[in-house]
């Protein structure tokens, strides 16, 4: 009878004894291919939990936790939440047929972490009408406020373009940029030994872009570079 093998990550077949973390419900297993191996949890069924939001959240958190713990031991190729195979043979056949692709990806991310730099626009202060201010004075203050607002947004847009161009030029294929309504996110693939340099770069960028708040996240497995 087929048994689901919920799969967390692929990596080079280890030549040392791994310390496997606990899974979502039970123990994890190491499935070794010729050159690429996988960590799996047997018997996990997403279908039985898809209508239970609390259970799904628990599974998502377990998925991320396992990948983070594995990545502290070696370079891993993190798989998307919900990845599973119907049998060990199906998993091994998949690994063998995609071995070169996965090897290339592992070589690209070896010894590196992913950092997310959130760039959040600062807000323009609202114009408050002071008590006792007559109509003409308020009109002039309002006109001045809109001129300042215009200059503020122009500077903000200029700084945004500067950030995007500089990070794209510096990191090239090691940067993924996502623009959202309320912020811009830069996903950066950085060598583990260059964390201090990255922090210095972010501090320097913050000084050059005073109309934005720059927030650097913690190092994570390279989810966006697989």
Language-model region placement:
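An interfacial alpha-helical scaffold signature
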Residues: 1-215, 219-226
